[in-house]
Amino acid sequence: MTHYPKITPETPFDAVIVANGAFPKHETLLRILHHAPHVIACDGAAKTLLDAGFTAQQMTVIGDGDSLAPRLKRQLHFISISEQDDNDLTKATRYVCTQHGPAQPQLTANRRLRIAYLGATGKREDHTLGNIALMMHCYDHFNVQPFMLTDEGIFIAACGDCRFDLTPGQQVSLFNFGCQQLESQGLRWPIYPFDALWQGTLNEAVQPIIQIKADNAYLVYITWTFY
């Protein structure tokens, strides 16, 4: 059973990818960003990071460069990827995977790359929906464990039997991505193999640990407790 402890400012991530959506405001998320061993900015997010006090040397920038001025690109560690089949978030994820490849054998099926995604929601709604859905694609195809962090909560891609450390009263939503078996312990309302995305929303933890029993993949959303 996979265990997901609570996310704190000290939670370790292999990399933090910053998209060009709503930049985080809460101190917990900003501390996670500042503690990151590797920060990757998706194209225009580089300017946001610079405005927030980061230096060009603290980040790698991935994208086609269409939203960055030439002068700014020359200052940055900019990796141009011009193909349009994937969005910048996918390109950044693939780049992180290439940096943690065969030379690091400790990364196996039991040790996925832990990537935190910031700035992936807000602004345009179509980008938000696409980025949230992309978490499952990253989990399935890149052998990463994605965590999408926003000022309101966190999305976690998961599969199979898992347990999550929570605080009773935290709001929980669960989105089914192929489960024929889907059960829970520790939630106010029982879950089942939902066939529509809205059906698993607006649940609540009633115990400090919730357990999910499943036979396939699902996406969990958990609200923060720091408000």
Which residues does each PLM region occupy?
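N-terminal beta-strand-loop-alpha-helix module at the start
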Residues: 1-73
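Solvent-exposed alpha-helices and their adjacent loops that cap or buttress functional pockets
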Residues: 6-11, 30-34, 54, 72, ...
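Structural motif
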Residues: 19-22, 120-121, 223-224
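Short glycine/serine/threonine-rich phosphate/pyrophosphate-binding segments
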Residues: 25-27, 48, 88-90, 124-129
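A generic secondary-structure signal
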Residues: 48-52, 95-99, 137
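Short phosphate-binding loop-to-helix
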Residues: 76-107
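Anionic-ligand-binding alpha/beta catalytic cores of soluble enzymes and soluble regulatory domains
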Residues: 112-162
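Long, charged alpha-helical interface segments
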Residues: 151, 158-227
